[in-house]
Amino acid sequence: MGRVRDCTGSGPLVAYQFLTVKASGLVTGRAASCQALKLDNNSIWDYIRFNRKEKMKIKEALKITDSFTKTSKMPGLSYSLPAWECKTGWKLAQVPGTPCFSCYAKKGNYTRYPAIKAAQYRRLKAIEHPDWVQAMAAVIKRQKFFRWHDAGDVQSKEHMEKILEVCRLTPDTKHWLPTQERQFLPDPEQVPDNLVIRLSRSKIDGKASSAWAHESGVTEGTARTCPAPDQKGQCLDCRKCWDKDVQVVIYGKH
């Protein structure tokens, strides 16, 4: 058991166990005292509890989070919420020329099977559960790659902070979060190294923006950079969406 003081030397001491975190901003040894500032005290204790013997089992976690999605396209699990509850996306869905106007998450299997929509609303409600962060991390930590919201989007600043916590607790998983919710974007320095948040362009063939470091867009032309349509709809060995060195990913219109 060790102790961490903030970098000013005047802050509270926080007890911690031996930590090995590659992507969360915490490191082992002496350097931990300053880098621990990337997590508040609650986050540190969350990490400790998560890695102790009493960590949540998958079966218990799924009772809180509800089910995840495993598609043949993706290299790992994904997670969906109801597209009807998108804050910005629902407004854009009324506007021709936006990706949300013909949103794939409001047609096909998403609407064909009532059980899918019901599960999405259960997941939406689950975000309020006090153990949601721990439960999500318990399931996701076994994944090399994870996609947030193959349907739906971030609901609030509090929801975004919870997502950041999940990413910090799963440093060996690469996370990809596409979003239209500009008002919920965190400060860039708060984003863990293992998370890529891609701000979605609001118009098809829309212009690039300097509002955020990573973007995604939709095209009806030849500017597509996502190879999935040429690979029977699969990612195969492509990981552009999860790669922080790739600033922009352009998809073909669904």
Spans of features found by a protein language model:
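Basic polycationic patches enriched in arginine
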Residues: 3-5, 30, 49-52
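Class I S-adenosyl-L-methionine
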Residues: 50-254
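Intrinsic disorder/low-complexity segments
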Residues: 20, 26-29
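Cationic, low-complexity basic patches in intrinsically disordered or flexible, solvent-exposed regions
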Residues: 18, 39
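Short, positively charged and aromatic/hydrophobic N-terminal segments
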Residues: 40-41, 46-48
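Short, low-complexity, intrinsically disordered N-terminal modules
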Residues: 12, 17, 30-33, 48
